């Protein structure tokens, strides 16, 4: 099993290209199931989750051609996928594939909307809380689907097709919003999705669906209107830049006292996180090239944050920000409101010398002057990269185990950091 070895103490200086967003690419790939015509996606990141979803779609009969690099010989350019879902040979998504990635559950809505039947295993993915699929199923039931749970599978039928409906989510859910949005595009009549997720990835999905012929208004607000259409057509769409990757490298730069240009990043996608970084003492400037992040030798200031649905502070940056706060000049409180059990990185950060106390859904971080390298173990995607950030600022060697989590969400992480001066390498074995 691969490990990542880090020798801390180096400032990050240089340019890090930001990849396409995984959390946008996955639902966009799944949206291909809604049409018999080709969907071409550009700027798709090269990640384990993307490769797994290609396998899952292939299981349904979808043909995917990878057209390599978009921009000449740039090794960091996103790949282009040409997706042809003209023929669906199987409407079952099996346990052995779906259990490995939660987002693969989203095939349920498009298959049901287009084919009228789907059988999808209950999902897997990161071990963060329970994250039930009830909101997805309730949305599809509202659209007229008949749904049963049988031996660990969701069996859904809509023999007469889906019908437009009013869908009200009791709590904001990005995944359920994706499901409702995709299914409603082919439903007969109008649908209104209330308390919808406002995340940029939802907007990106809506933008792509509109290019495919969907009639959608209100994406990015809490109320989305969808006028169903009979069919969707071919389209070409570029995946938006990854705001979580952007925030991660911005926090790593602030942690090491560096100066990094995050090329291709969009500041409008993560304003709350950038505001927190400014309060912590980082200098952040938007340019035509991307976002420049710097921190001088004044030290890191403590900042309280509470995770919240977009446009609030992203839960997917909570672990990384906690790593930054371990070296703050004072104490801060980090409150997690989105997922339970998302403090699994606390014990591992403590192995590096961090002082963190848990009080329910809040972590109280007492900043320390120095962290010391040690062997640590990743527990999930975002926790694993928080350990890398801490390792960059720790004295001595940090060895991060279970780095397969990183490969699910960060493209060429060691390469991007090492080109900016980090002493980091992957050790196979």
Swiss-Prot record:
It comes from the Bacteria. Gene3D superfamilies: Enolpyruvate transferase domain. Pfam families: EPSP_synthase. The active site is at residue 126. UDP-N-acetyl-alpha-D-glucosamine binds at residues 102, 171-174, 316, 338. It catalyses: phosphoenolpyruvate + UDP-N-acetyl-alpha-D-glucosamine = UDP-N-acetyl-3-O-(1-carboxyvinyl)-alpha-D-glucosamine + phosphate. It is found in: Cytoplasm. Pathway: Cell wall biogenesis; peptidoglycan biosynthesis. HAMAP family: MurA (MF_00111). Belongs to the EPSP synthase family. MurA subfamily. This is UDP-N-acetylglucosamine 1-carboxyvinyltransferase. It comes from Xanthobacter autotrophicus (strain ATCC BAA-1158 / Py2). The gene is murA.
């Amino acid at each position: 099993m691969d490990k990542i070895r880090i020798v801390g103490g180096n400032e990050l200086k240089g340019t890090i290209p930001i990849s396409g967003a995984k959390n946008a690419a996955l639902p966009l790939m799944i949206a291909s199931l809604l049409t018999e015509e080709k969907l071409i996606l550009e700027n798709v990141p090269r990640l384990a989750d993307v490769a797994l979803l290609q396998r899952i779609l292939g299981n349904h009969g979808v043909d995917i051609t990878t057209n390599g690099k978009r921009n000449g010989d740039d090794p960091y350019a996103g790949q282009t996928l040409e997706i042809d879902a003209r023929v669906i040979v199987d409407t079952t998504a099996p346990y052995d594939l779906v259990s490995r990635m939660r987002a693969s559950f989203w095939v349920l809505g498009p298959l049901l909307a287009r084919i009228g039947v789907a059988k999808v295993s209950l999902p897997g993915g990161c071990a963060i809380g329970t994250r039930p699929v009830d909101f997805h199923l309730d949305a599809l039931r509202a659209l007229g689907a008949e749904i049963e749970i049988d031996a660990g599978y969701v069996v859904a039928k809509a023999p007469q097709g889906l019908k437009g409906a009013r869908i009200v989510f009791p709590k904001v859910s990005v995944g359920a919003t994706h499901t409702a949005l995709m299914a409603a595009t082919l439903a007969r009549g109008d649908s209104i999705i209330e308390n919808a997720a406002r995340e940029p990835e939802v907007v990106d999905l809506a933008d792509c669906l509109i290019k495919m012929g969907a009639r959608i208004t209100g994406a990015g607000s809490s109320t989305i209107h969808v006028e169903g259409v009979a069919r969707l057509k071919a389209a070409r769409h570029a995946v938006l830049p990854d705001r979580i990757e952007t925030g991660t490298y911005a926090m790593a730069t602030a942690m090491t006292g560096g100066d990094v240009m995050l090329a291709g990043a969009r500041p409008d996608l993560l304003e709350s996180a950038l505001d927190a970084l400014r309060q912590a003492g980082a200098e952040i400037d938007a340019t035509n090239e991307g976002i420049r992040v710097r921190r001088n030798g004044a030290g890191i200031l403590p900042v309280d944050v509470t995770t919240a649905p977009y446009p609030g502070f992203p839960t997917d940056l909570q672990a990384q920000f906690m790593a930054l706060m371990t070296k703050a000049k004072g104490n801060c409180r980090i409150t997690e409101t989105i997922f339970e059990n998302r403090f699994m990185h606390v014990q591992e950060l403590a192995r590096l010398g961090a002082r963190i106390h848990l009080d329910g859904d809040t972590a109280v971080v007492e900043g320390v002057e120095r962290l010391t390298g040690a062997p640590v173990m990743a527990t999930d995607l975002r926790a694993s990269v928080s350990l890398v950030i801490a390792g960059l600022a720790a004295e001595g060697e940090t060895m991060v185990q279970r780095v397969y989590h990183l490969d699910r969400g960060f493209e060429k992480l060691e390469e991007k950091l090492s080109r900016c001066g980090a002493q980091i390498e992957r050790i196979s074995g």
